[in-house]
């Protein structure tokens, strides 16, 4: 009996460590600054100058799916997305989880940028990233906080939510995210520990499924893309020839 109680305590402690690690990853991901996101979107627009907003968003989504699927198939493999930093010392959850969350954050904030929604405040970025990752449950928390049931709820996060309400909303989003994310990832983690080959297939396929869920949530949050680019968003040329060097990765 005493042993069972001890095991239960260890499980609780481990859960607490995992939660702290996830929160640390979330904080790092939501610190992606507005200028960095704008630079990434501008890079993509220069690489594909004829893309409409809808086409560019689809391109952003495809790059995201490709990156997270690759990271699931080969944990620790390189799947480069401009704008992402390296997250180290995340043994409790793993660098792959950090990469997935940061990639989700970059996708979410980039899509917001294409929609003309600036996300400069750290708390707003965190709320938006969490709500999109959660999908329907995130939407419900946002709608409850702002008192609106708008179908495309992404812009609601950018509305004037009082500081205390924003803090409480983020706490609710974090709690729900930790519960939901750990439940999904635990099954994938087991699959990746299977013999080589089988684990890679499960890891890649599992990440692809979760990634497609993030894409779907993003579409529901922001709604249809703008039909055209605002005239004010002029894209500078590529004086250093960087795009020519990287076109083979598109």
Language model features with spans:
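Terminal, membrane-proximal amphipathic helices
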Residues: 1-78, 102-250
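Transmembrane helix boundary and interhelical junction motifs in multipass membrane proteins
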Residues: 81-92, 197-198
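Hydrophobic core segments of alpha-helical transmembrane domains in multi-pass membrane proteins
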Residues: 89-95, 201-206
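Glycine-rich active-site/cofactor-binding loop and its immediate structural neighborhood
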Residues: 90-96, 100-106
